[in-house]
Amino acid sequence: MKIYNKSYSLTQFESFLSCFIPYRTIFVDIETTGLSSKKNNIYCIGLAFFQNDQILIRQLFAQKQQEEKEILSEFLDFLSKNCNSIYTFNGKTFDLPFLEKRCALHGFSFSATDYPGKDLLQDFRPLKNLLQLPHLRQKDLEQFLGIGREDLYDGGKLISVYMKYEETQDPELEHLLRLHNHEDMLGMLRLLPIYQYNILFQGEFKIQSMHVITEKDHLGTERNSLEIHLSLSDGLPKNITGVNEQIRFLFHGKEGIVSLPVCEDTLHYYLPDYKNYYYLTEEHTIIHKSIAQFVDSQFCQKATPDNCYLPKKGMFLAGNKKSDFFRFQQDRKDKTYYMDLSDLLDVDQKILSADITPALQEELQLLIAERLKKFKPML
């Protein structure tokens, strides 16, 4: 068995990493001779951890498959002295169950549940559509951030390389094997800024200004949208942009522009206490029951849930659910609720900052966050 250590200055990584990562966190990645934890062995365990103002990458490398027990023993001893939580990439599905099984076969006790942490792959899955990535392999995410690699192999292709190394002990083959694991460890650390995109799903941004714009689509039809300028609580590692029928967005650094479709229509606000109203059949409107006694009964009938509404013509923004702002509908069974923008717009189709109340801020933050969560790029 060989043990390799390489240190990096914390300044080589994003400055927030040491604050973002819980105390005594270890990043773990394993290399194996196959996918079966019953039949195959672990030949390398990579560990990355913070030590003072440095990041240290340690590799426990088995020169022979028979040395698996040694590297597992060293791994468990290290965890017992230095670890409270474990971070991995796809570790909950592969690395950690594999380690548990191999430890058990050698008579060691190891349970991943004793080291609560994060699986970066699972955490990043909800971001796939937002980042518009076809796959979420570690190398795909690294390429998205512009992270290069010297390593050209994947774990599966290195199995035959390890078998040849085991026979020859060729140092060049060992370098290839260790390089892949080492760059996986570095890659995990460098992918941590992707967590910053979660601020978009959590609505951690502030609306700075809003105005309605009118544009022509590819068919020449005029369409209205509400353009919202945002400031983000934290900067994003890479600019992103996207468009579909529900939202258009551009985020760069600590700023963002979001456009939401707006419709011009006559919509209805349905009154819940319909029993207190009467419907005028000629005027197609409602009056309170206290006034109905003065109207000819042949032109007046008790209101129903379907016709007890106040019509409003204007510009409307579709929302996710009914609220104090989103309360208009196309009809009573319509599950989409709309907010009337007309009274908020000035002569330049802008919504003044003074009119963006804390309650409206929160409502629109939730709406934008929900649209971003559900975003799927147009094909």
Name each model-derived stretch.
Residues 1-28, 33-40, 50-379:
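DEDD superfamily 3′-5′ metal-dependent exonuclease/proofreading module
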Residues 45-47:
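Short beta-strand scaffold segments in enzyme catalytic cores
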